[in-house]
């Protein structure tokens, strides 16, 4: 039957076509933070917390992982005597996000 792929051919397609997904970005919360920062370039911790509905502790851990990967910078400062944490996407973070999106698209277009 035309268009039908046998098991062996499907194995070859999956080996050849599926790109590995970045494990740092594959987390739902880290991906959400990166998606927000792609459009905003930088955002306050409180904004990210509100938009992602994450707890402070979980968000703090996840942005630390993004920082360790070099995907974001974390700037801690004071604003009117109140502590303020700003997350800023890096060029490496932009590239990683774009590569992640391309990898996902390759799964869809097979």
Predicted features by range, described:
Residues 2-10, 15-18, 35, 91-110:
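Amphipathic alpha-helical dimerization/coiled-coil segments
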Residues 17-58, 77-80, 84-88:
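N-terminal helix-turn-helix DNA-binding core of bacterial DNA-binding proteins
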Residues 70:
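Glycine-centered, phosphate/nucleic-acid-interacting loop/turn motifs that mediate DNA/RNA or nucleotide
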């Amino acid at each position: 039957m035309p268009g039908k792929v046998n098991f062996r051919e499907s194995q070859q397609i999956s080996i050849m076509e599926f790109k590995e997904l970045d494990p740092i970005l594959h987390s739902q919360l880290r991906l959400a933070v990166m998606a927000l920062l792609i459009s905003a370039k930088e955002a306050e911790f409180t904004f990210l917390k509100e938009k992602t509905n994450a707890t402070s502790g979980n968000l703090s851990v996840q942005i630390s992982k993004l920082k360790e990967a070099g995907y974001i910078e974390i700037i801690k400062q004071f604003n009117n005597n109140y502590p303020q944490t700003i997350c800023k996407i890096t060029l490496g973070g932009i590239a990683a996000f774009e590569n992640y999106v391309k990898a996902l698209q390759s799964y869809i277009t097979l």
